[in-house]
From Swiss-Prot:
Record-linked Pfam families: PLAC8
InterPro entries in UniProt: PLAC_motif_containing
Naturally occurring in which organism (per UniProt): Xenopus laevis (African clawed frog)
Protein name: Cornifelin homolog A
Family statement drawn from the similarity comment of this UniProt entry: Belongs to the cornifelin family.
Residues of the signal peptide: none
């Protein structure tokens, strides 16, 4: 004879501590590195290729639509930087060259 189960097993509750950090520079701190600033202003496509290569991907990756969003999200995840893919999209959509400069400065600082 089987008895009905009156109590379900309880899951273990744990708290994940995240070692999240912030970007080393703000999106609009473009003038911190004048070389990156000038490249982002006048030839952002070349800066995007350099950022992609510095991140460890193919330098031609930015030629694919949406790939620079994946690179930005990858930088955030690799270095545990707070944010979300939605914030990345908004930043790249409305402040694209400045966001590229921020990514370049971040990789320069961390590498």
């Amino acid at each position: 004879m089987s008895y009905p189960i009156s109590a379900q097993p309880q899951g273990v509750q744990g708290y994940m501590t995240s070692n999240s950090s912030q970007w080393n520079s703000d999106v609009f701190d473009c003038c911190e590195d004048m070389g990156v600033c000038l490249c982002g202003t006048f030839v952002p496509c070349i800066l995007a290729c350099k950022v992609s290569q510095d991140f460890g991907e193919c330098c031609c990756l930015p030629c694919l639509f949406g790939s620079i969003l994946a690179v930005r999200t990858g930088i955030r995840e690799r270095y545990h930087i707070e944010g979300s893919i939605c914030k990345d999209w908004v930043c790249l959509s409305f402040c694209g060259p400045c966001a590229l400069c921020q990514m370049a400065r971040e990789l320069k600082t961390r590498n």
